[in-house]
């Protein structure tokens, strides 16, 4: 039996001393705002929104990164509806996945907005993402900062996404293992 469940991406690590984020959901769906490439997010919303949701925008500050989402028992019907929506649109979705920005993340956000699901936005410490652009990953011996795990001082849940090719070949797997 459960009260709430966390859905987390495979490229994400939760620090063992992380506070209990379930205590911060207020009994609602909860996630962390996407804190990365806003051009990518806006383009993705426009692409998927226009084709599947009869809208090409919504407030980017409500766009949740799919790598950290908390649901509870009250969301069973909502999730069933999301799955039904996906199954109904899967052929068209599979044609655009890989061609457009994003995959399921944007569709989940657009569907959530369409359904007007009440949510709690959690602080970025629970899905610290886009670490490269925040200068929290060491990629080059000439960087002015030291080769340490700087991200440990900046959050509790580390999402190793959007890591560009780099001279030291340090990809998500490198950082997860380290």
For each predicted feature, which ranges?
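An acidic intrinsically disordered interaction segment
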Residues: 36, 68, 76-78
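Residue-level detector of short, conserved catalytic/binding motifs and their immediate flanks
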Residues: 3, 67, 156
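GT-A fold catalytic core of metal-dependent nucleotide-sugar glycosyltransferases
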Residues: 1-43
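Short, basic and Ser/Thr-rich N-terminal targeting/leader segments
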Residues: 8, 64-65
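Small-molecule pocket liners
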Residues: 28-29, 66-69
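A glycosyltransferase accessory/donor-loop signature
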Residues: 59-60, 64, 73-178
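A short secondary-structure junction signal
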Residues: 16-19, 42-45, 79-84, 170
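Short, flexible, basic/aromatic active-site loop/helix in glycosyltransferases
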Residues: 47-60
């Amino acid at each position: 039996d459960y009260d709430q469940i966390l859905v987390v991406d495979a490229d994400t690590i939760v620090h063992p001393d992380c506070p209990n984020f379930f205590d911060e959901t207020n009994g609602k769906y909860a996630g962390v705002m996407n804190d990365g490439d806003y051009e990518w997010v806006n383009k993705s919303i426009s692409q998927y929104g226009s084709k599947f949701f009869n809208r090409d925008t919504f407030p980017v500050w409500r766009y949740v990164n799919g790598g950290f989402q908390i649901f509870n028992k009250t969301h069973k019907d909502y999730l069933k509806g999301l799955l039904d929506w996906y199954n109904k649109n899967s052929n068209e979705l599979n044609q655009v996945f890989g061609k457009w920005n994003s995959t399921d993340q944007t569709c989940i956000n657009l569907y959530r907005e369409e359904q007007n699901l009440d949510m709690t936005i959690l602080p970025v410490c629970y899905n610290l993402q886009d670490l490269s652009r925040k200068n929290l990953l060491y990629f080059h011996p000439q960087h002015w900062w030291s080769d340490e795990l700087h991200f440990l001082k900046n959050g509790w849940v580390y999402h190793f996404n959007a890591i560009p090719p780099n001279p030291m070949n340090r990809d998500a797997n490198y950082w997860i293992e380290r």
